[in-house]
Amino acid sequence: MHAFFPRLLLLLLFLPLTHCTYLPSLPYKIDIQQGNVVTDEMVAKLKPGMTRSQVRFTLGTPLVMDIFHGDRWDYIYRTAPGGRVAEEKKLTVFFQDDRLSHIQGDFPQPPAFSESEPAQNFFSPEQTFTPAPDTDSNMNEEPDKKGTVNFLKENQTNFYKDNQ
């Protein structure tokens, strides 16, 4: 009987410690997010014929830009909430002649990609673009007699004679 009470006391002391292994919140595990967050709304804004800069503005910088596949951008988003099984979403964007041609991935196809006619003009009619002035045509003109080039040509021989 004397040995029974100390054993019972030890059992009662260590019993609460065994319950710590059954608590799911201990230890705390953080949510891990990797890659680009791409939503259905962002994918719905994509239209065939968009430029690379327009796609980058809409979706953000791609996670993978492969040098061997220059006309393909990959957007990958992976999340592991609280140590649970990771979820992964992928979106691959394809370009042809630097214009968006089609997309693949875990997102529904936007309505614009089901149409047969690709969108051509993304700028409003008010926007006009004027080319930069041609500065190369001025390079071929001969400077006048009082110009710097003629002055240097005339004084070049005198300069070298004086410095020898």
Swiss-Prot record:
Q: Name one GO biological process term.
A: protein insertion into membrane
Q: Which Pfam families match?
A: BamE
UniProt cross-references to InterPro entries, sorted A to Z = BamE (IPR026592), BamE-like (IPR037873), BamE_dom (IPR007450)
Query: Which is a Gene Ontology cellular component entry for this protein?
Result: Bam protein complex
Asked if the record carries the keyword Membrane, the reply is yes
Alphabetically, the GO molecular function entries are:
protein-macromolecule adaptor activity
Please list where the region (Disordered) is annotated. Answer: 111-164
Chain intervals with Polar residues compositional bias? 117-140, 153-164
Q: Which cysteines are joined by disulfide bonds?
A: none
Question: Signal peptide: which range, if any?
Answer: 1-19
Q: Which UniProt keywords apply?
A: Cell outer membrane, Membrane, Signal
Q: Where in the cell is it found?
A: Cell outer membrane
Grouped into one coarse class, the protein's main location is: membrane
Subunit structure, interactors included = Part of the Bam complex.
As for family, the record states:
Belongs to the BamE family.
| Function, in words | Part of the outer membrane protein assembly complex, which is involved in assembly and insertion of beta-barrel proteins into the outer membrane.
Protein name, as recorded:
Outer membrane protein assembly factor BamE
Organism, as annotated: Nitrosomonas europaea (strain ATCC 19718 / CIP 103999 / KCTC 2705 / NBRC 14298)
The organism that produces this protein has a lineage beginning with: Bacteria, Pseudomonadati, Pseudomonadota, Betaproteobacteria, Nitrosomonadales
